Amino acid sequence: MKSLQADFFKVMKEGAIQYAAPLPFLDLICVGTATQTEVKEQIDLMYSLIHQQVDVIVLVPIDSKALVQPAVEAVRKGIPVINIDIQLDAQLLEQAGVEVAFVGPDNFAAAYEVGKLLGKKLRNEDKVAIIEGLAVADNARQRKRGFIKAIEEKGLR
C-alpha cells in the first residue's frame, strides 16, 4: 500500500485483515510505506514480496510509472499482480508485454462530473481554486485534468 499512516489506507488495511481473519487458507501480509512519497521504499517492498515468493500481490502504487518494473518482474516470476486505486502506466505495461488487472475508479470521469456539478452552481465570473494531491500521483493528475475540462466547458477559470 501507499502510506499506512493515511486514514484511507488504514481503513483499507483493517478491512483486508478483517476479511482474511476467518479464512484459514489465506495468509495475509500487509505492507506499506510510512508516507505517500516513499517510492524507493515501495519498490523495495515489492521486491521483498517477490523474493518471498508470495502467491499474489495487490498493489496501490505511489508512482504509476516507477512501480511498473517491479510489477512486471512479479508477473514474469508467476506472481499475479492486482493493481488497485491508482492504475499502473498502461503504456509501460504494454511495452513490457505484461497484463495487470486493475480495480479502481475512473478519476478523470469522477472529477469531470464534480466539475460539471460545480459549474451549474457558479457564475462565469466566479473563480475556482484547485488544491491538488501529490503531483507524482497519476490519479491526482487525472482528477485535475477532468475537473479543469469540466469547468472550462462552463466558462469558469
What are these regions, as identified by a protein language model?
Residues M1-R157:
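A residue-level marker of the well-folded mature domains of exported/periplasmic proteins
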